[in-house]
Amino acid sequence: MWSWKCLLFWAVLVTATLCTARPSPTLPEQAQPWGAPVEVESFLVHPGDLLQLRCRLRDDVQSINWLRDGVQLAESNRTRITGEEVEVQDSVPADSGLYACVTSSPSGSDTTYFSVNVSDALPSSEDDDDDDDSSSEEKETDNTKPNRMPVAPYWTSPEKMEKKLHAVPAAKTVKFKCPSSGTPNPTLRWLKNGKEFKPDHRIGGYKVRYATWSIIMDSVVPSDKGNYTCIVENEYGSINHTYQLDVVERSPHRPILQAGLPANKTVALGSNVEFMCKVYSDPQPHIQWLKHIEVNGSKIGPDNLPYVQILKTAGVNTTDKEMEVLHLRNVSFEDAGEYTCLAGNSIGLSHHSAWLTVLEALEERPAVMTSPLYLEIIIYCTGAFLISCMVGSVIVYKMKSGTKKSDFHSQMAVHKLAKSIPLRRQVTVSADSSASMNSGVLLVRPSRLSSSGTPMLAGVSEYELPEDPRWELPRDRLVLGKPLGEGCFGQVVLAEAIGLDKDKPNRVTKVAVKMLKSDATEKDLSDLISEMEMMKMIGKHKNIINLLGACTQDGPLYVIVEYASKGNLREYLQARRPPGLEYCYNPSHNPEEQLSSKDLVSCAYQVARGMEYLASKKCIHRDLAARNVLVTEDNVMKIADFGLARDIHHIDYYKKTTNGRLPVKWMAPEALFDRIYTHQSDVWSFGVLLWEIFTLGGSPYPGVPVEELFKLLKEGHRMDKPSNCTNELYMMMRDCWHAVPSQRPTFKQLVEDLDRIVALTSNQEYLDLSMPLDQYSPSFPDTRSSTCSSGEDSVFSHEPLPEEPCLPRHPAQLANGGLKRR
């Protein structure tokens, strides 16, 4: 009996204890189990802005409770709570914290967390002066706050981590930050290139400031390049972020002087003269202006160095801009002579020289009386000259007429083809005659008229071409559209072709159609046929304009090729220039899209692949330029007009024999001066095309007249590095512009190098939009009077040439140097 009562007593006691220990279901602390990780939504708000937080609700919600840092959130004159939404007017840094929305419903409770940071802090790369003490206090405060919910790590200042790529010069201090939080406080560790990063892995070590979640590396060197990853973790989760560091070595190079400056001057006696010298140097340069003088009747001293007089040298308070200009006032005849701009740094010396010529002021002189005999001689000479010109004109006209006739009647086969097209021309004797006689060369029959009822060519009968079943497309399957462009005798129109794909006979394809204009000649017809046959022989490749078909029967000749909707590469690049960097500023200009460095390298890579394929087919382009590269809707580069190139089977060069108009600014020296064309002359043109790409459609040699280009190229001048171009790509251009053709790279080598560069180039490397306007070359015609480009600017650098005698150095710091011709 007693034992039964004892058992009953203990049962009642245990039941009461369990009921007392059961927590209240309304406590907000139990809204989320302590063992579960929590998702946190981050908000960055600038001081003074409106903060709005909205809670996600279920349909059966019964109550909503808002907390901040675990404390009940109360309404105030700035804080308004309306059920599932909280609004804070004119937010201040004190409003920062972890907000929680706790909802209760019959199905259970749910909590949504918001991390709010009210700050106007700068991004990580610019925020280097943090108050570590305040951060430490904040961290300690976080640790000591009671009743904190378990929270997986989260970023507290993601805006400071937006810049992922950091390119810094050598010897600079680098600081990467990963500001974060969580409950319990997370730990921080760093990886380099995916491996654990310890202080002894780096010369000089590094510092980690856990209070500010940052790593600091002093005096970085090229070996510090790599990917640095911060890992923040606690028992409820882990997050990471990667920074990329690129350390740029300072360029050890002597000063670079802009080509063409100072320039020669010819002035009148008593005038004022200004010489200018542009100097580019990474180490601080020392600039002097010198005048060459004579000593005892000699300009050269016993040491074989010229005698010079120092006219201007840098002082303590003199700026480089002041030193780049030399002013001479009220010049006399004694001021005439040679002047030199000498610039030196710790690496070496550079100099450019110019001549000053002083003339007497022009005076009006009385007209010289001419004798009757002198006048008679002038009249006879003028008459003889005019008669000679008339006779010469008649002879030239006769020769041209004879050439045109023999061109067609005796040599009508198309010279541009490796295999000539069989064309036969019928000459009708009379309208009544049923007989006709054929010309001696096998060509095509004429006599058909175009659909308009008029001859296709003025003065040329329409020719019937042999049908090629592989390429022939019925005319009723081709619908012509708007014109795309035209030349002197040909035009290109947009069209829709039905059934180009034999497997899909009803598919409609947008195409471009080449055709002749009404005033074209027999030569133009043969050229178009030649281009068509050349495209058949070349075959298909992704990076060339491919032949799709032709209409050769029952009407004019239509050559059907691929359509590139975005126009040529030059226009494509110019349309995507950043706003404000056009040469004639247009405030309404909106670029199509922003191009990254990888986009530009990809353009060059695709063109190189197309040229590699043409070279493998023994095809020399002769006119490779951005204007002859077309861009499709999918941004695929396609080389055009290669059908006009020459097919070579037995020799690997082509020597031009006619005097057609040539694009001289893209031509290699051997093509320009000796009229020799090879694959290596195409490589030179590819180097100019590279320069066009990285100047976003700039015009080569801006401000340089064509007549001066020959002299400049012979002297070894080359265009300078574009602003948006790496040193590696510029060296590729310079290799393409090597004076010796055999020393230039092949297209196969260019494809391999560009393929490697594309793989290493980041998609996030956008062009430098802060570059000054004059770093780009103008896209307008090269005239010195252009309002959009400066004729005084030069973009040339100079290849090293044999040394000239050196100047003695007259300040002590230049005592052992000399002048060398660049």
Swiss-Prot record:
Its biological purpose is as follows: Tyrosine-protein kinase that acts as a cell-surface receptor for fibroblast growth factors and plays an essential role in the regulation of embryonic development, cell proliferation, differentiation and migration. Required for normal mesoderm patterning and correct axial organization during embryonic development, normal skeletogenesis and normal development of the gonadotropin-releasing hormone (GnRH) neuronal system. Phosphorylates PLCG1, FRS2, GAB1 and SHB. Ligand binding leads to the activation of several signaling cascades.
Question: Where is the chain membrane-spanning?
Answer: 377-397
The lineage, from the top, is: Eukaryota, Metazoa, Chordata, Craniata, Vertebrata
Q: What is the effect of changing E274G?
A: In HH2; also found in a family member with isolated anosmia
Q: What is this protein called?
A: Fibroblast growth factor receptor 1
Q: Where is this region: Heparin-binding?
A: 160-177
Q: Which family does it belong to?
A: Belongs to the protein kinase superfamily. Tyr protein kinase family. Fibroblast growth factor receptor subfamily.
PROSITE patterns in UniProt = IG_LIKE (PS50835), PROTEIN_KINASE_ATP (PS00107), PROTEIN_KINASE_DOM (PS50011), PROTEIN_KINASE_TYR (PS00109)
Ordered alphabetically, the record's keywords are: ATP-binding, Cell membrane, Chromosomal rearrangement, Craniosynostosis, Cytoplasm, Cytoplasmic vesicle, Disease variant, Disulfide bond, Dwarfism, Glycoprotein, Heparin-binding, Holoprosencephaly, Hypogonadotropic hypogonadism, Immunoglobulin domain, Intellectual disability, Kallmann syndrome, Kinase, Membrane, Nucleotide-binding, Nucleus, Phosphoprotein, Receptor, Repeat, Signal, Transcription, Transcription regulation, Transferase, Transmembrane, Transmembrane helix, Tyrosine-protein kinase, Ubl conjugation
Q: What is the effect of changing R470L?
A: In HH2; some patients also carry GNRHR mutations
- Outcome of swapping Y99C: In HH2; impairs the tertiary folding resulting in incomplete glycosylation and reduced cell surface expression
Originating organism: Homo sapiens (Human)
Comp. bias (Basic and acidic residues): 136-145
List the record's Gene Ontology CC terms alphabetically: cytoplasmic vesicle; cytosol; extracellular region; glutamatergic synapse; membrane; nucleus; plasma membrane; postsynapse
The active site is formed by D623
In the record, biological process GO terms are: angiogenesis; auditory receptor cell development; branching involved in salivary gland morphogenesis; calcium ion homeostasis; cardiac muscle cell proliferation; cell maturation; cell migration; cell projection assembly
Q: Where is this site: Breakpoint for translocation to form CEP43-FGFR1 or FGFR1-CEP43 fusion proteins?
A: T428, V429
State what changing I239T does. Answer: In HH2; some patients also carry PROKR2 and GNRH1 mutations; impairs the tertiary folding resulting in incomplete glycosylation and reduced cell surface expression
**Activity regulation, free text:** Present in an inactive conformation in the absence of bound ligand. Ligand binding leads to dimerization and activation by sequential autophosphorylation on tyrosine residues. Inhibited by ARQ 069; this compound maintains the kinase in an inactive conformation and inhibits autophosphorylation. Inhibited by PD173074.
Molecular function terms from GO = ATP binding; fibroblast growth factor binding; fibroblast growth factor receptor activity; heparin binding; identical protein binding; protein homodimerization activity; protein tyrosine kinase activity; receptor-receptor interaction
According to the UniProt record, what happens if one changes S346C?
In HH2; also found in a family member with isolated anosmia
User: Known consequence of changing R577E?
Assistant: Strongly reduced autophosphorylation in response to FGF signaling. No effect on in vitro kinase activity
Q: Name one Pfam family in it.
A: I-set
Membrane topology label: Single-pass type I membrane protein
